[in-house]
């Protein structure tokens, strides 16, 4: 990290908190004029650029690569063959927990009992039991750039009422690894796989788990990398905003789910100004977000947000800006590889690129249902942006309002492609292969709906089986055998 003064470190912490939490009000978060409150965003971004992010990420990834799960399990099963402690360390046993004081920081080793951890440490290793973590649980902070928790087994509860918890890398690296059990993770902001000028990881290898947090969590990256990875079990994820595969400025947010019938929810707290009392911001579930220049406000290109679910019958519940969407040079991807899935959203979702961005939703198989209540979704590109919804099989149903199902607007490019099955497409207007004309850039918009692989399909706007329709204003609706 480049040398930073205490004032600069304080500015970074306040700026991060302001952008991701304090600026959250019942108003439009895409109206960047509302973000011109102190701390000054330009000062914050210029200070952040002083940090050697590449060096910081390299150090964190070297640690991550050294975390071999098979090695950890072998280590647990053969503790008597390993030397846990080194000369010069101060060892302080207290019941089932041993405190180890080293020149690098505190390490804690817990036995197989039901332990309670309230103190943060450089490293916590728990060998089993139904434990409670009331601390940061693998969260770095100023003055403590690294922290790791490894819990081998048990039905554990991770509870934090403060920011930065449960696998959070803030100006450093934070890692939380849970190797089994039905666990509950409850946190506020910057948690559950969150990286800001650092790397944050939460890895859970199995069980029926529950994750709840507020903002910037569950795989969120901002000038860093945030990762949450689950290998199996029927899991539940609940967040308010900026979560579940969210990438902000120069950030990568990853949410990886291996198997199980999972439920993802994001939204319900902050109303969107376009439909007060009816719609809420999600900014989650594979969403890349940047700051659009507004007046004298500094702009910054968005990051990359990815949600990848390998298999299971899953439910994705979001509202505005969700489910494979990008805003202002951001890239958002939601990929589901197998299962009969339900996607529910409001607007700017389900493969939507908004303002020079890209949004992609791909579903490889299963009988799926897609609902975008207002629209501007389901393969929509708006304002020099691209949006793709790609479904590779199954009997699917698409329901939207307007500007959806292969729609381009404001010089955008939108595609919905469905390969195989008996599919149904319902839309009010401006879609199913529709491009609006915008003359101020001397460019056109393009909208394409492809349905291939045969099947008996239904279209609300006049499409027919085994026929290609060329729509006015650069639109194509093609149903091919």
Report residues per predicted region.
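Terminal non-domain segments
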Residues: 1-111, 480-481
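Acidic/polar low-complexity surface segments
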Residues: 164-167, 193, 218-219, 240-246, ...
